């Protein structure tokens, strides 16, 4: 979806939304007159770990390589990393599909507004996946912000002015200092931002990139730099309202500076914006720490979204406290650190050169979430922003088979010595939920937010009287927001015509379907992303209208912001009338691929494993080497207690990693 809500509402499937109000706990105290220069001090953990950390500083045992790739097609990771989708230019896409002279902006002069005047706005109903209009009155017009209030709501004027002034005088300059500037003057020709206060069905607030384009591009656009807040759930004048202002303004800035940033990174910085404005709370963080097997580097719809907010929030708190130094989050945004996580590893390496990969940085954060002891090693395993320690799970003697998410964490313990621990992790993991339909390879669309992947080739249909395109298709895309298309161009690629297939859809509830599009889950058209898994289906498209011509054929996958699925696979592509057949088995088959990549669907499974050892007088973090078959043997001596930490560490996939742990008396 193209909207960034402020916080999660766990009961909403398929969309980001606000946290249930009862879960929110506003930060104590008013907004400080001077913005804080660092994270607010958060209370020390109140829930003790199952083992007692030591106050004796002890260095961790750190070999030169903590993660060893196992036997699998390692080049797949390199190939995928090099296949970068293009950014989504909504205006250019609309022009390519629909033609016409599409303006970049709605106006070039500032809005002519007056207090008391009313305007009509589009609002998203996240629950029912529709858009509707409301009438709102301008109640405040300042140098930075225009505050509109739904005419059906009774909001005291002094509270409107209070929050408007907090935003203009404190949040606005603070966010711009930390995260950079928003788009000015933008689509509306006005440097002022619009904040619409209304009831929102299914969410508590959002920023939508659709509002930043003209209605010629998206008919639901409000043609303003703006965000929307549920003034019933978060009344103006409240701490939660002001926190939402800080949160959504970061999204607005971020979209302008780096629209392709993945949601986990973008949301993490919006949570950090709340913290750095003195408005943060720990509701989502606690949800994550209760369920730490949550993948940091992705974003899932449904009830689990609260944990994703918490993971992103805690990681950014840790990163900012430990490694920000003289850098600003704006620098991380400009470096596209969300898509290039080695940027974050390099940031950490300035202080600690032993951090080589993002997995090393992630592992230190994961240990800190279990330990939070500043006296162990050099202080890397602690930060003030953690409200309690991560939950652990007990292991019984014998062999336990389990799965863990990529960049999620299983904490196992306490484990009492004497004890032997044998770990055996899977060598490989699937890229998506299926393997190629035939042969060893298929074309994968890649995945990402605000991105466009294309696969294009020339087709000579001049010598035939009819033509048919057939192919095998698998997809898991965010329904009604992210679409795949099959198109033909007969003017060299300037304009493209979408083609109907067996499972394409022509309805367009969100203004994103360019004609005939594939969306949702293949084989389950009425199921939202995250419900059931897709399956391979047979597709057939009539090319007869283009016979007698030399044309270009193009597959597209276009995703908006906030949520994305595993993407699309295509295989066994044929136009039998001209003798064309391609199963992605050899080289590029004459295709021009942007974002798309040939894949076997199998990636090497990498691992992060740590053993936290607690003696009577010291705490140690053991970083074992993993052999080339993903195996480790560890020992806990008599009188020691331990926690075993296991994480998957393979990029690009959201499929879980399988492993076995065997506990026995040595």
Predicted regions and their residues:
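N-terminal module-boundary/linker segments of secreted carbohydrate-active enzymes
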Residues: 53, 57-180, 184
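Acidic/His/Gly-enriched intrinsically disordered linker/tail segments
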Residues: 210, 214-222, 239, 243, ...
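Juxtacatalytic substrate-recognition/specificity segment
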Residues: 140-269, 277-301
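Exoplasmic/lumenal beta-rich domain surfaces
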Residues: 487-550, 598-629
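Short, conserved beta-strand segments of beta-strand-rich sandwich/propeller modules, principally
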Residues: 468, 550-554, 641-643
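Bacterial signal peptide processing site
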Residues: 28-30
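Beta/coil-rich, acidic/histidine-enriched accessory regions frequently appended to metallopeptidases
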Residues: 34, 38-52, 56-66, 341-458, ...
């Amino acid at each position: 979806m193209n909207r960034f809500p402020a916080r999660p509402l766990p009961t909403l499937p398929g969309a980001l939304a606000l946290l249930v109000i009862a879960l929110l706990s506003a930060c104590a105290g008013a907004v400080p007159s001077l913005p804080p220069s660092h994270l607010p001090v958060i209370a020390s953990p109140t829930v003790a770990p199952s083992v007692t950390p030591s106050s004796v500083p002890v260095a961790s045992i750190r070999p030169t390589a903590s993660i060893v790739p196992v036997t699998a097609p390692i080049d797949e990771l390199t190939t995928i990393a090099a296949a970068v989708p293009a950014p989504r230019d909504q205006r250019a896409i609309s022009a390519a599909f629909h033609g016409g002279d599409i303006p970049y902006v709605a106006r070039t002069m500032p809005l002519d507004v007056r207090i008391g005047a009313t305007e009509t706005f589009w609002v998203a109903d996240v629950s029912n996946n529709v858009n509707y209009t409301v009438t709102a009155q301008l109640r405040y017009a300042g140098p930075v912000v225009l505050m509109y209030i739904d005419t059906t709501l009774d909001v005291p004027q002094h509270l409107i002015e209070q929050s408007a002034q907090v935003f203009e005088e404190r949040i606005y300059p603070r966010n711009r200092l930390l995260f950079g500037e928003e788009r000015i003057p933008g689509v509306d020709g006005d440097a002022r931002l619009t904040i619409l206060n209304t009831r929102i069905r299914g969410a508590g607030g959002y920023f939508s990139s659709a509002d930043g384009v003209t209605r010629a591009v998206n008919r639901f656009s409000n043609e303003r730099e703006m965000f929307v807040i549920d003034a019933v759930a978060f009344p103006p004048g409240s701490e939660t309202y002001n926190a939402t202002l800080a949160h959504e303004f970061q999204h607005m800035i971020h979209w302008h500076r780096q629209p392709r940033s993945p949601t986990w990174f973008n949301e993490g910085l919006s949570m950090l914006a709340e913290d750095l404005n003195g408005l943060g709370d720990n509701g989502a963080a606690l949800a994550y720490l209760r369920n730490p097997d949550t993948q940091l580097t992705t974003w899932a719809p449904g009830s689990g979204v609260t944990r994703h907010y918490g993971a992103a929030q805690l990681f950014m708190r840790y990163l900012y406290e430990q490694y920000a130094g003289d850098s600003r989050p704006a620098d991380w945004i400009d470096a596209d650190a969300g898509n290039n996580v080695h940027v974050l590893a390099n940031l950490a390496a300035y202080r600690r050169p032993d951090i080589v990969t993002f997995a090393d940085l992630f592992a230190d954060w994961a240990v800190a979430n279990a330990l939070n002891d500043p006296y162990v090693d050099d202080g890397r395993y602690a930060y003030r922003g953690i409200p309690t320690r991560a939950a652990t799970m007990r292991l019984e003697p014998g062999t336990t088979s389990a799965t863990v998410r990529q960049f999620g964490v299983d904490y196992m313990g306490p484990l009492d010595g004497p004890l032997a621990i044998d770990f055996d992790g899977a060598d490989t993991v699937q890229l998506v939920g299926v393997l190629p339909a035939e042969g060893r390879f298929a074309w994968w669309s890649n995945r990402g937010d605000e991105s466009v992947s294309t696969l294009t080739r020339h087709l000579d249909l001049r010598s035939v009287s009819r033509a048919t395109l057939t192919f095998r298709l698998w997809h898991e895309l965010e329904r009604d927001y992210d679409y795949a298309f099959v198109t033909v161009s007969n003017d060299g690629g300037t304009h493209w015509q979408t083609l109907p297939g067996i499972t394409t859809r022509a309805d367009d509830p969100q203004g994103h379907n360019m004609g005939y599009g594939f969306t949702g889950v293949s084989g389950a058209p009425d199921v939202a992303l995250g419900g059931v898994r897709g399956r391979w289906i047979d597709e057939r498209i009539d090319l007869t209208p283009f016979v007698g011509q030399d044309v270009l054929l193009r597959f597209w996958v276009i995703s908006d912001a906030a949520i994305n699925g595993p993407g699309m696979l295509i295989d066994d592509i044929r136009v039998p009338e001209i003798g064309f057949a391609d199963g992605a088995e050899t080289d590029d088959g004459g295709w021009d691929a942007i974002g798309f990549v040939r894949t076997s669907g199998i990636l090497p499974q990498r691992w992060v494993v740590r053993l936290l050892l607690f003696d009577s007088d010291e705490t140690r973090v053991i970083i074992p080497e993993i052999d080339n078959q993903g195996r480790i043997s560890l020992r806990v001596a008599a009188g020691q207690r331990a926690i075993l930490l296991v994480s998957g560490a393979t990029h690009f996939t959201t499929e879980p990693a399988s492993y076995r742990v065997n506990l026995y008396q040595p």
